[in-house]
Amino acid sequence: MKAFMDKEFMLQSPVAQHLYHTYAADMPICDYHCHISPKEIYENRRFENIAQVWLGGRQPDGSLAGDHYKWRVMRSNGVPEEYITGTKPDRERFQKFAEALPMCVGNPMYHWCHLELRKFFGYQGVLNGDTAEEVWNLCNDKLQHDDSMTVRGLIEQSNVAFIGTTDDPIDDLAWHKKIKEDPSIKFTVAPSFRPDKAINIQKPGFVEYMGKL
């Protein structure tokens, strides 16, 4: 039986395999829309565990950060919000996500997660509720001890040449300035205009925000 995912994943002909491995695989990536924090890029954050990478959560300033596509998977499967953006322990939050993931076979999220596990962590299995513990331990060991698994390290491993962060019009771009002045950062990081707060007139705080703008 063919493996669920191997190096020829989605490459269904010899021509596709040749074109990808010979030309496309090593091409630099220009990511014009991402949610990586410029502060975390500059400070080269090291994540403590895979839940922090994948699920994010409530930040010290009260804001939320994380992959809302993964949150949607959990919500669609009836996971209580306290495990998604709440204060439950990261291990429990990851368990809930792992249990929900098999329910979205056919959704790109299922493939994205397994591609990431293979590329960055060398995990060849399938993530579900039963394998969550071994995946948790494997990923956390690499995140905590491998110097290539910091924010900058992951970007460099992915051969990213350009990152466009999503920024509010009133951001002072202080972290972008620091990044530009740091010669150790070899890839380009630039802000992009995302005025969500200026058009969400129905949300609390709109008037105060417009005053700042």
Give the label of every model feature segment:
Residues 1-213:
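Metal-cofactor-binding active-site regions of metalloenzymes
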